[in-house]
Amino acid sequence: MSVHAATNPINKHVVLIDNYDSFTWNVYEYLCQEGAKVSVYRNDAITVPEIAALNPDTLLISPGPGHPKTDSGISRDCIRYFTGKIPVFGICMGQQCMFDVFGGEVAYAGEIVHGKTSPISHDNCGIFKNVPQGIAVTRYHSLAGTESSLPSCLKVTASTENGIIMGVRHKKYTVEGVQFHPESILTEEGHLMIRNILNVSGGTWEENKSSPSNSILDRIYARRKIDVNEQSKIPGFTFQDLQSNYDLGLAPPLQDFYTVLSSSHKRAVVLAEVKRASPSKGPICLKAVAAEQALKYAEAGASAISVLTEPHWFHGSLQDLVNVRKILDLKFPPKERPCVLRKEFIFSKYQILEARLAGADTVLLIVKMLSQPLLKELYSYSKDLNMEPLVEVNSKEELQRALEIGAKVVGVNNRDLHSFNVDLNTTSNLVESIPKDVLLIALSGITTRDDAEKYKKEGVHGFLVGEALMKSTDVKKFIHELCE
């Protein structure tokens, strides 16, 4: 049997609180194999001041039986004391303790799992940095933090396919937990996750910022290049196959994106987005049925339906777009349906032709991730397929690049795709630089009527809204408020 040995040992002092669980030994072993010095204490055999006197670099709360309120000993007090001082990580009950400490509810998870593996999706940060999507993780639990009681200071970082929370992280402090067992031999990439724990330092995430070269956009782009390359090799899905299908007339009729948006009599147009999750927010509505959501938007007066088709971080698919187009064709006359936008990280003609065949009227081109020659090539190719793209920018320089290629519909993303921080002034600062014949759409961060009203007064033509609409209890009212 091979033993894992770290190539570059991480010399950290870890205090491991044992909640009377046999898996504590596995956690200890994994930490030691990465080079850490580990001190283990039962949850009733040491005090918080005594732990503080040890001056640990990292605190780790182990798995354990029972409920965090009654069976975790000093674990919750440790989380309260060390939050903001050093990194605090929790496994299984350790995560449940975090949920409880910050005001959440730990309850029956809806299923009892013992030694079973489940694939998860995650946000690629913290413990999940550089961990592939869809890995199998080992679960031993019947309790979990409930999504409805998620504390405002925490964000969901990982979940199962049926929506059970598998990871949470404090938005400010280096406090993070997972419901599964990274130290189990059945968990994929467990050693990498333990190593990621040891690589975190200090009391805040601000102190652990990733360099731009490892930004979220870079990771998504790299993953999508792999995905597209693999799919384009499958018989029946090659570029030549797609081209043959297009030449046979299999692409459905389309509407002119620019004409639909510019001919609206509303004060502003709404591009309503089908969005199950995001890297910044984690799961939003994993059980959403794309066609149902799109129909709600269309009946409420949306001018376009944006369909996220990226599978790893946003939990979308091209089939979602196909289904959205089908339901719109069934429920609306050809000239009265909303346009369909493929919201994707596009870098190749393959993705554009794929979108056209699936029923998209337009595609998103992100200036930030494309060289100027490639941007121009993809824009021209889209036009050859009779699609006017939505060209996304985030700065005055990117806006100039978009205008140079002749873009007629420009979206200003208020979210920086490297850091994923939102600044609603990003759109406002570019309004005066937009030519009169170019439509300006504000993207990201629009959550209230006041946000929309400010933009309308500045001359913004419309808004792309995703998360706020996905969470809205009255989609029709919300869209009406945005438009009028």
Swiss-Prot record:
Binding site for L-glutamine: G64, P65, G66, Q96, S142, L143
Listed EC numbers: 4.1.3.27, 4.1.1.48
Region (Indole-3-glycerol phosphate synthase): 215-484
Keywords per UniProt: Amino-acid biosynthesis, Aromatic amino acid biosynthesis, Glutamine amidotransferase, Lyase, Multifunctional enzyme, Phosphoprotein, Tryptophan biosynthesis
One Gene Ontology molecular-function label: anthranilate synthase activity
Subunit structure: Tetramer of two components I and two components II.
Full protein name: Multifunctional tryptophan biosynthesis protein
